[in-house]
Amino acid sequence: MAKSFTGRKRIRKSFGRIPEVTRMPNLIEVQRSSYDHFLQMDVPPEKRANVGLQEVFRSVFPIKDFSERAVLDFVRYELEQPKYDVEECQQRGMTFAAPLKVTLRLTVFDVDEDTGLRSIRDIKEQDVYMGDMPLMTANGTFIINGTERVIVSQMHRSPGVFFDHDKGKTHSSGKYLFAARVIPYRGSWLDFEFDAKDIVYVRIDRRRKLPATTLLYALDGADSAELRAERRALGKDLLPYEAQGMAKEEILGYFYETITYQRAADGWKTGFDAERMKGQKLLTDLVDARTGEVLASRDTKLTPRLIRKLQDQGLQEIKVAIEDIIGRYLAIDIIDEKTGEVIYEAGDELSATALERLEKMGVEELPVLNVDHLNIGAYIRNTMAADRNASREDALIDIYRVMRPGEPPTLESAEALFAGLFFDQERYDLSAVGRVKMNARLGFETDDQMRVLRKEDILKILKILVELKDGRGEIDDIDHLGNRRVRSVGELMENQYRVGLLRMERAIRERMSSVEIDTVMPHDLINAKPAAAAVREFFGSSQLSQFMDQTNPLSEITHKRRLSALGPGGLTRERAGFEVRDVHPTHYGRICPIETPEGPNIGLINSLATYARVNQYGFIESPYRKVIDGRVTDEVVYLSAMEEGRYTVAEANAPLDAGNRFADPLVSCRKGGEYLLVRPDMIDLIDVSPKQLVSVAAALIPFLENDDANRALMGSNMQRQAVPLIKADSPLVGTGMEATVARDSGVTIVTRRAGIVDQVDATRIVIRATEDTDPAAPGVDIYNLLKFQRSNQNTCINQKPLVKVGDRVQKGDIIADGPSTDLGELALGRNVLVAFMPWNGYNFEDSILISERIVRDDVFTSIHIEEFEVMARDTKLGQEEITRDIPNVGEEALKNLDEAGIVYIGAEVRPGDILVGKVTPKGESPMTPEEKLLRAIFGEKASDVRDTSLRLPPGVAGTVVEVRVFSRRGVDKDERALAIERAEIEKLAKDRDDEKAILERSFYTRLKELLLGQTSVSGPKGMKGGETITDETLAGLTRGQWRHISVENDQVMEIIEQTGKVFDDSVQRLQERFENKVEKLQRGDELPPGVMKMVKVFVAVKRKLQPGDKMAGRHGNKGVISRITPIEDMPYLEDGRNVDIVLNPLGVPSRMNVGQILETHLGWAAAGIGRQIGEMLDRMRAATVEAADKARTAEDLKERLRSIYGEAVYESDIAPMSEAQLMELAGNLRRGIPFATPVFDGAREDDICRMLEAAGLDRSGQSTLIDGRTGEPFDRRVTVGYIYMLKLHHLVDDKIHARSIGPYSLVTQQPLGGKAQFGGQRFGEMEVWALEAYGAAYTLQEMLTVKSDDVSGRTKVYEAIVRGDDNFEAGIPESFNVLVKELRSLGLNVELNQRTY
């Protein structure tokens, strides 16, 4: 595979044996595709599919007024260009959104009062502004009020029907009570459940239960259904009293088969049904009805063989004993033919008396239900018997009473309510997913546009429920991923917008009825506030709209790929049981079994697996390669969990031979959640890659297969907390995923088109495009780099160019590194030399001992950017002012401020320093006689403002890197704001000029190519017609004059004109873009109400590694730095190299994360080979080396690389390199050869040994270490090697905090708590007990009074300390006064009598 620009600079040797058949999908595709699907921004309005925003508008509109004289229709919607781009929104605290314009059509009708006919009187169409719709950035995030947010996808239960039982927990007998639940996407839930007496009940929306037959009676009977269909075809409907519900006969006929008994001369007989009687034990003798012969005696079991024998004998009818008929249930109503009276109803039990009466009446045929109470229970019949209702009217009214208790029911209102519950598309929506799931479970093939319930669905659900009770069929597993689906951004937004539009709809309908409809326009009817508020509420405060974790690129990607079971319509932490949180077999390849938070959210928040994608129905799919006749093909199919259950799937690392056939006679496979060994010809699919079952973070852990799962979980979670360091360093031992993560995270800069680098500096890269592109597109790409920007977590975002002027780049190459990336690879930490050994107790309990070299060389130093802002408001007493003129502040404190009172960029600031000077007017206070005297003498007005400057808080010290000044429109900008504006305009002008210069250069080059050799017709002054144009001709003219030359060739003239037009258009577009940006800059800013000016100051803080900082490896091996030891005291190797870090070997065996040891060995080998390459490189670069030796060394180097990388990689990537490229590659490898050991397909033990030998190191991976303090070797050899360590975001500087005095709580007057509030330590109940136990009464009194909430005592102690006196007197704590007031509020007068004894 051809390497990219950065890939050639450092080639990673992979130990993977399984080839990549399919590319990993873009890691943030989940977010992007979902929102694109919702907005359909790039689709012309007339071609938009009925999904997302289009579907929401279509479902709410048309809106009719109450008298149906006017209709408001939706025509189309359009999203205009956003007002500000992403960067402007972040700086100004705005939302990155586009105005949504909706075209609506208002149709007004005339209604003929006599005939009721309607005719159109007027149609008005108009565009209406419906608020702003937030847009997604290229990286899958949203900018809301200036901060970057992510909408997390939600896992919820799929709509559809689910069958379950209570696992015997409800009833004391332990009997299973079965239940079915229909969950729609929107609308009322429908539950069917058995009780302990085996009666089936129904609940609507978890209300009071009703017998299930009540619901069946309320449904249309067969005759009514036909009649309703006929009426609907005519545009009418059945009236409530015309419709008939399901009759008992129809209900019983659906659920049970019928057996017909016929009268015989001496009793009753029935047909011999072989299928029904198979396997039964005879309770009476089996007698042939024709011959009277006993064919089988009682207690005989009817085996298939015996039944076949009876059929062969021609048995057709058998006698039925009277006791067999008694206790059976009638299948139809029995009617007295003389009177027409119903004597027995369908479902009635036949008693001996009833049978006699029927015989007397001369009944010849008796249809009964096939219920044997063994295989078929009489549950529906018993429910019918228990049901008080027997007609449609009773059933509807009963349902109405349950749903609307306390309201008087009428038949019309009851029918309207029932129809609206499950059969009205406005109120009930199964969704396409729900219908697909229901079809699959019930065995229907209904179209997925049928979004409401049907009679057939309800009957089939009941039938399956009854069959489950009878022991047939399986219940559903609700944790199966076929029953859980993902709601991504687009769908969540769609639901939210629908809520907003429905609120709007009510208001529109009322307004249509109240205004003069003939004169209004659509915009007069619409108030878009509810819809805009719904959007704002969703993005601003929904549980699923989260502040993006931007600590490093991996944390961004992981956040966008997160799946949460919490949130609106989801689970809650407290109620989620163990099963929901557990790993399920269907998670394989879809949800990572490793990456989930520790703590209360474990298992509820998950991460999408690397290759997984979400399909159109919201189910997670995983890719598989097809296996045909035992041969693995390269055809890849994506399957959801439901579909996968039908296939036999082999694992990706099953051994294959050269012909891609399975090498073993039996292969380990999985099918339907079970693991089995099967023959190769029975296999249907094979996994695409071994890493498809883990998430991105887990796939970055080398030797994951050698780590315990709990530690792997900690490792994947802690990688997300790694702070970007000043010098990024990609891991020596990686997994091959690093480049993918860096590219997809969006922190690096990826080229949009192929081209040649024209200009490079620290802030931008200019590339001249060489690709043949659309003529309208400019021929130059300018990439602006982010310099020292603050991330959401206060880490530093800084991009560095990787290219030089003249470099050729291809489309998709990485041309600039971002935070935590190194040559286009993710680099979260540093490779450090580690020794596993105890060292004087400094690595007790996972503590980490580090060398001073690490601090000296800034190995783990990071930059953090803190943002401080101050606002100047318009107060009642006057305007606050940002100024350098601050009362009672010396010149020394103002040394860092400019004339506008704002700190300079580059100033070093310490805690307490003024960043922005601000004064606030204070109210006039009465003057003292002295002030009056001073004013009388000097006439000066005493200072009437107080100092409210922005000062640097304690614990922060650093350098000011950026200042932004925002002024309200109409307010004059100060000098600093104008200076910032000028600098910004200059930068924009430089971009414009550079782009224009490149465009001109390419245009005139092209023009010259076209003109040379042509015959001129006319031209500028001094040029004759008819001469051939040469270089000299053109050199004598200015470039601007070339455009005025006309040539004979018409085709060439046409191309010249066309090229000139494209060039002019490009230049004009450039100028327009520049003017637009300048206009935005010069326009005032939109600030919150009452704010006149706002200043933001960004301070960069350099954080060196120090004791108390938390560090970790990638295997969950975390610890806190205990000590920084001088370099000379650290253990060192025999060649004099000191180790950087000493870890405790006891941290490995009990944690079972052996991966870190393997990583150490392989890292040791990588560094050893790197040193060998470095030595060769030094020999090649040495000035004294002769050309022949240099060439020989170069050949040796190539051979060395061939032996390490293998023939295939060498031939494709290294052999074609020029000498300069080879030298650059070798230079990048001297630190160590980067290895990739993909998860579950990584380096084996023999690979590591081979690499150690290649590096000339001991196969054991252990070395002799010498004690730096004594110079004596340690007793045993020590495991030494390179491990990739991360510095985590838990820095001691952010946590350490001290206070003497500070803010106090208003009511209790006790100090506040926490660093953020500058609070104090709480002396709590247990601490009081400790002092009581020691009898330290005075210490205790001091703690509870003057050091806490004795207000007057506090002041007196302060005054005493100032005087140098150390005596104090304790008073009454304020909390005692609070208690007294509390008691008084209860009406108890408590008085405190103070006596001195």
UniProtKB/Swiss-Prot annotation:
CDD domains registered for this protein in UniProt: RNA_pol_B_RPB2
Superkingdom assignment: Bacteria
UniProt keyword annotations, A-Z: DNA-directed RNA polymerase, Nucleotidyltransferase, Transcription, Transferase
Record GO cellular component, one term: DNA-directed RNA polymerase complex
Catalytic activity of the protein: RNA(n) + a ribonucleoside 5'-triphosphate = RNA(n+1) + diphosphate
A Gene Ontology biological process term: DNA-templated transcription
EC nos: 2.7.7.6
Membrane-spanning parts: none
Single GO term (MF): ribonucleoside binding
Xref: Pfam families: RNA_pol_Rpb2_1, RNA_pol_Rpb2_2, RNA_pol_Rpb2_3, RNA_pol_Rpb2_45, RNA_pol_Rpb2_6, RNA_pol_Rpb2_7
InterPro entries: DNA-dir_RNA_pol_bsu_ext_1_sf, DNA-dir_RNA_pol_bsu_external_1, DNA-dir_RNA_pol_su2, DNA-dir_RNAP_su2_dom, DNA-dir_RNAP_su2_hyb_sf, RNA_pol_bsu_bac, RNA_pol_bsu_CS, RNA_pol_bsu_protrusion
SUPFAM superfamilies: beta and beta-prime subunits of DNA dependent RNA-polymerase
Function noted in UniProt: DNA-dependent RNA polymerase catalyzes the transcription of DNA into RNA using the four ribonucleoside triphosphates as substrates.
Family membership: Belongs to the RNA polymerase beta chain family.
Subunit structure: The RNAP catalytic core consists of 2 alpha, 1 beta, 1 beta' and 1 omega subunit. When a sigma factor is associated with the core the holoenzyme is formed, which can initiate transcription.
PANTHER family: DNA-DIRECTED RNA POLYMERASE I SUBUNIT 2
Name the UniProt record assigns to this protein: DNA-directed RNA polymerase subunit beta
Organism of this sequence: Rhodospirillum centenum (strain ATCC 51521 / SW)
Gene: rpoB
